Amino acid sequence: MRSNNNNPLTRDEILSRYFPQYRPAVAASQGLSGGSCIIDHDTHRVVLRRHHDPDAPPAHFLRHYRALSQLPASLAPRALFYTPGWMAVEYLHGVVNSALPDADELAALLYHLHQQPRFGWRIALSPLLAQYWSCCDPARRTPFWLRRLKQLQKNGEPRPLRLAPLHMDVHGDNIVLTSAGLKLIDWEYAGDGDIALELAAVWVEDERQHRQLADAYAARARIDARQLWRQIRLWHPWVIMLKAGWFEYRWRQTGEQQFIRLADETWRQLRMKG
């Protein structure tokens, strides 16, 4: 269901107009941030998500809704409702662990996603990295950051090994173990891109875990494991810069200390690797 109202409504207006029998249940839970909440009525539970990024155009939030509308129930929560500034999606009942599933399970989940029809919009990292630079705290801009950004822009993004729909924020807190199996939540960064970019961006603990995931995926997708790992490594500098820039971006938006700590740690990793 999609509303044509062009003026963003408050949460209370959304509830009274479209979900009059529902009440807020939990302030924050699975993949929620920026004023989103869980609402319920009897045994029915819905996630009400708010467009919380003031620097992102409304079209990005609409893409999030469209991605959920396209995906099968075996991968993601169902999209239920959209109006400018808000969407409602199915609440997934299940277990969320901070740790990733084992390599074979995660490879199967990602391969299932990558077999779906493309969303229709490409993920472009170069303009995103430039946006993070321009929107960050000017006091945080360093010559090192600018050099790395210009070097990546000069080299250009790696040529895709295989294009597919991507989630692009795969970590333990965004994976729900439901009665029907593993599913992914928080699809706001989804788009079409290289499967190796997705694998490069998974929030792994170390290189050993990363190699295990890459090998498991290669076996399932019938791709040469060495070729896939080389492609993942080509994307690695882009992904590290993406994470550092995102932490800086969120620090500027929220002022939350966790983001500045994560940004500092990511910059240290980049400097250690030259």
Curated annotation (Swiss-Prot):
GO MF annotations in UniProt: ATP binding; thiamine kinase activity
InterPro entries in UniProt: Aminoglycoside_PTrfase, Kinase-like_dom_sf, Thiamine_kinase
Transmembrane segments: none
Keywords associated with the record: ATP-binding, Kinase, Nucleotide-binding, Transferase
Top-rank EC class of the record's enzyme: transferase
EC number in record: 2.7.1.89
GO biological process: thiamine diphosphate biosynthetic process; thiamine metabolic process
Gene3D superfamilies reported for this sequence: 3.90.1200.10
Keyword Signal: no
Catalytic activity: thiamine + ATP = thiamine phosphate + ADP + H(+)
Keyword Cytoplasm listed: no
Pathway annotation: Cofactor biosynthesis; thiamine diphosphate biosynthesis; thiamine phosphate from thiamine: step 1/1
Pfam families tied to this protein: APH (PF01636)
Function: Catalyzes the ATP-dependent phosphorylation of thiamine to thiamine phosphate. Is involved in thiamine salvage.
HAMAP family: Thiamine_kinase
Family: Belongs to the thiamine kinase family.
Name under which the protein is recorded: Thiamine kinase
Organism from which the protein derives: Salmonella schwarzengrund (strain CVM19633)
